[in-house]
Amino acid sequence: MLQPSPPHYSSSRDVRHHHHHHHHHHHLALSSKARVFPLSLPCNFSSRVSFKLQLHCAASSSSSVSPPRCSKPNPSSRKRKYGGVIPSILRSLDSSTDIETTLASLCLNLSPKEQTVLLKEQTRWERVLRVFRFFQSHQSYVPNVIHYNIVLRALGRAGKWDELRLCWIEMAHNGVLPTNNTYGMLVDVYGKAGLVKEALLWIKHMGQRMHFPDEVTMATVVRVFKNSGEFDRADRFFKGWCAGKVDLDLDSIDDFPKNGSAQSPVNLKQFLSMELFKVGARNPIEKSLHFASGSDSSPRKPRLTSTFNTLIDLYGKAGRLNDAANLFSEMLKSGVPIDTVTFNTMIHTCGTHGHLSEAESLLKKMEEKGISPDTKTYNILLSLHADAGDIEAALEYYRKIRKVGLFPDTVTHRAVLHILCQRKMVAEVEAVIAEMDRNSIRIDEHSVPVIMQMYVNEGLVVQAKALFERFQLDCVLSSTTLAAVIDVYAEKGLWVEAETVFYGKRNMSGQRNDVLEYNVMIKAYGKAKLHEKALSLFKGMKNQGTWPDECTYNSLFQMLAGVDLVDEAQRILAEMLDSGCKPGCKTYAAMIASYVRLGLLSDAVDLYEAMEKTGVKPNEVVYGSLINGFAESGMVEEAIQYFRMMEEHGVQSNHIVLTSLIKAYSKVGCLEEARRVYDKMKDSEGGPDVAASNSMLSLCADLGIVSEAESIFNALREKGTCDVISFATMMYLYKGMGMLDEAIEVAEEMRESGLLSDCTSFNQVMACYAADGQLSECCELFHEMLVERKLLLDWGTFKTLFTLLKKGGVPSEAVSQLQTAYNEAKPLATPAITATLFSAMGLYAYALESCQELTSGEIPREHFAYNAVIYTYSASGDIDMALKAYMRMQEKGLEPDIVTQAYLVGIYGKAGMVEGVKRVHSRLTFGELEPSQSLFKAVRDAYVSANRQDLADVVKKEMSIAFEAERECSSRSGEEEEDDEEENSEEDEAF
């Protein structure tokens, strides 16, 4: 009985999991002829190795199996017609799990060729190995290299490197020498697994046995180099082979690829560089008659079509179109047969380098030579035209596949669906899906998230759900695809739909969610600001048997830090460290930024120091947050200190950091220092950004340096990067310097640039117009803001409106009354203010719109509301409506106040009702009404309107008596100065 493999030859993955599963295998005896080295791979694998088999089988049975996705699949090798007993044996093996018993029951004496067929027809590595061991168990069996090649290939394709290594050692001790085919096959399977250096070590071993690679092996090495992006090395190897040399240049290749073969206890590179050569040296080196040795350095030329195809693809991917074309021409000249793959490769090479017409002409040449295009040919042309933006041509090639008698394959449908989905062509996508349904073709699993994303982006969430549910009826999606589907919903904030998909897996199939699905679901909750749900999901992960990874911790931590939930973030960070996961720089950066936003600079500094202690190097984002935080707080010395530390640590400062530094200097008015930093930014690639320029503009504006500010502003203009802050700062500067014409020019430019988009920007321009006395233009702008843009007004807006009311001649008592109504948030205060303002500016249509809002329901029993209605109707010339409003006011029990009397006397004057004016005048004269300049002025203006200038002059004299000339003068002057100061401060504050 064979001995089990020693523990040190089992893979690290088996060591971690061997205690979970047990598997029974048949015990087979080997003949004396088939000598097996004690360390060879036995048929009764150790529990560690058997776990792999069991795990593999379990995974295959539980995971989704991609259904056939084209109406006419390519025939498999099982469709080949074999003579004799082979077909019946294959059928028996297919229907049996007990391979050994089945083979033994047939009692057949198979020839080596028939044995080869049975080995090749097995689809799983375990079955290949069991059939092989059965053959070895017969005394008549003679080991041969072809059988070992089949077994080694099966193990390599399955990534069973430990088993392959043991099989190789067994092969050597059975005296079976590898051939060129063996080496070529090993290079191929290792290369396809991404183990480039390990693959090439087989060629080195080949050289030690004095074998020289044949053309097939050479082409395999070239393909490995090509697929790993090592185009120059591939070219050197090919040319070296032609000259009779082998040029591998192993030292320049990374020792361990990204998939980490170095992680296992006995890693592949160590095996290939030590154990492998040791085994090879134990046997006498024999030169095979079938292979040329390295001493034969006669020039060689490739002769196989497959070799030329590989080389053409190599030069195409390397961008060496001339070399690819020369090889194609050489094939034509030297008589090397050209096949469909050759043309496909040339078409792809030409098309991907922008030569679509040449690609099209190659298709015609292909047909002229009698070489039929296959589905892949049309797939290539379809993708090329789609990439070029010619969707109609791409779809034409899709339709042509069936026209010429071919069948679209998985790649075809995936490509056409992705193309249409990217361009949001919903109807066309559904037409393709309908055609696939008619031909009983299922949608490829990888296309499901793409189609769903198109639906969701177009607001067709119901259709997206229907597609997902339909696909799930007969197919279990992989975790990767499920995560992609959840992410489609997450990106649009559709957390309920994402949640349904997430929990649906557990409810429908009883499977636990993968960590990737948890990570995306946490992202979905984060996007929807449902942080409690995200935390709850995270806390329940372990109970469901899924452990968080670094991505889980980092995502959750950054989500919490992003919304300044620092306490929860700290707890996650502590748990992350306890679990052995190392937070990345982005994680620390998010937390430091959160502390800075909250003004917790000392906590930010503590975390920065902890970050350095754990060996995580701070990046420019970390330093930028700290520098900006100190700059905003006016702590210039600390900001500069961290800037110097950043330079000492060799971290390149970006524009954000330098802008923060300028901001710090601006806070304390250090112009020269700010200039130095700004000049440094000018010398950098792309120059200063708009944020840095705005910081410098602000500093110049505060210091009143017009020329330098204009220079910076003009530079922004030339680059087309002026933003709202740039324009506002320049308006503030010009207005502060009394340069109102220039301020208005900037305001006009800002308006034309389309940057008037929010309340703040409108306020800035309106304040500028108000300061320049362009009251009507200011009101037009306000109407655009209020009615057309429907922006929410803020206190800055109303400050400007009250300034306009004062400048528009509205009685000061009326302005105060409206301002009080606004401050007290009285109902309908805003339409009362706007109606009064538009009336004062002569914009009666706008005024009546606002008045309609006041009168559409019950007018509030407030003086400000009735006064606004009376004033609006009076100003627009509708005397009857104004008087009706006054009468309704009295009916409501509201006595007229000074504002009402002023508006009422104006109505009398416009209507020519002199007696009415006289009544108010009389009450004012005899003290029945409180003396008011506004009311005296209203009476005087009413007499003028009624063509009684004589009475207007009388009122003027009475005003002189009531308000002594000197007091009137000083008071008026003081009020004007106070008003001007108030207006100026209000206008300035709007900036």
Swiss-Prot record:
| Ranges where the record places region Disordered | 1-27, 61-81, 965-991
Instruction: Extract the InterPro entries matched here.
Output: Pentatricopeptide_rpt, PPR_P_subfamily, TPR-like_helical_dom_sf
Compositionally biased residues, Basic residues? 15-27
Q: Has keyword Cell membrane?
A: no
Question: Can the keyword Repeat be found in this entry's annotation?
Answer: yes
Q: What Gene3D superfamilies has UniProt attached to this entry?
A: Tetratricopeptide repeat domain
Q: Quote any Pfam family the record assigns.
A: PPR_2
**Comp. bias intervals (Acidic residues):** 975-991
Q: Where is the composition biased (Low complexity)?
A: 61-73
Basic and acidic residues compositional bias, start-end: 965-974
According to its UniProt record, which protein family does this protein belong to?
A: Belongs to the PPR family. P subfamily.
- Protein name (Swiss-Prot/TrEMBL): Pentatricopeptide repeat-containing protein At1g73710
